């Protein structure tokens, strides 16, 4: 057992798991709306091509991986998960409000880039609850039974409950169990792309209406009119990157790792959460 694991045992002599649920958007990654738009646009077009027995567009995952690594994944997050591997009983789960199929897809791509696999299941919009005001919320009590079931399969824990659990999220009011929330600063770096970059020209000429539907544009009479409307949308989207410089030196996950290492072995989990909430 390495030094960090020995320190961990001072907090959890029975090797109780410490479960960190981590939000996806604006916590692990920045503003990924451009990539979501591209992903669903390709799906829309391929659905049409499949119906008419035409060759479908191949989504360029290599390009996505490059952009995840360089721009979209929050700085130092990959180092954070490598540091987590040094601890015997810290368990990472994803808890996002994103739609289920997209969340599972993009998380698998993130895992390939950072060379780390999160615990399963991945908690998504399907695992949200509706509060008394009719708003969707995350709830530790909802996902906890599924976490216990998953950890029991590892056969390294003997547990009926989880003593140490928290959610790291950039939103203040997202969690029902507010005492378990570690709010982090928002990471909103946006890597803007041309949404048409993967679409062959011959396919675009025949199916540009699908692009218009995706971006809620009025149908054009010809390709020229389409391009005029499309580039107005694209230019507006590029303007949304104006705040990117504010996020270039983000150190949240670096500081989180440092605080965790310095304090995990010498304070209660409740006090540790209080310290982690102070990280900027």
Each model region followed by its residue ranges:
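Non-catalytic pre-domain segments flanking phosphatase-related domains
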Residues: 1-22, 31, 37-47
């Amino acid at each position: 057992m390495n030094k960090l694991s020995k320190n961990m045992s001072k907090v959890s002599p029975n090797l109780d798991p410490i479960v960190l649920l981590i939000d996806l958007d604006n916590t692990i990654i920045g503003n990924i709306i451009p990539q979501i738009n591209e992903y669903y646009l390709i799906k829309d077009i391929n659905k049409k091509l499949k119906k008419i027995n035409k060759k479908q567009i191949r989504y360029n995952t290599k390009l996505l991986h490059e952009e995840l690594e360089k721009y979209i994944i929050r700085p130092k997050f990959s180092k954070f998960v490598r540091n987590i591997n040094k601890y015997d009983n810290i368990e990472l789960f994803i808890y996002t409000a994103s739609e289920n199929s997209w969340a599972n897809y993009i998380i698998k791509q993130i895992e390939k880039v950072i060379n780390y696999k999160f615990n399963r299941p991945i908690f998504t919009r399907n695992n949200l609850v509706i509060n008394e005001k009719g708003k969707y919320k995350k709830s530790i009590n909802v996902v906890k039974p599924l976490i216990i079931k998953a950890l029991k399969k590892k056969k390294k824990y003997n547990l009926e409950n989880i003593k140490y659990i928290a959610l790291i999220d950039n939103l203040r009011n997202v969690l029902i169990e507010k005492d378990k929330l570690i709010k982090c600063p928002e990471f909103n770096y946006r890597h803007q792309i041309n949404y048409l970059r993967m679409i062959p020209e011959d396919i675009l000429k025949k199916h540009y209406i699908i692009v218009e539907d995706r971006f809620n544009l009025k149908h054009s009479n010809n390709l020229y009119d389409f391009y005029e409307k499309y580039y107005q949308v694209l230019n507006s989207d590029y303007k949304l990157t104006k705040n990117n410089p504010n996020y270039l030196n983000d150190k949240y996950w670096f500081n989180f790792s440092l605080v965790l290492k310095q304090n995990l072995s010498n304070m209660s989990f409740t006090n540790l959460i209080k310290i982690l909430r102070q990280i900027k």
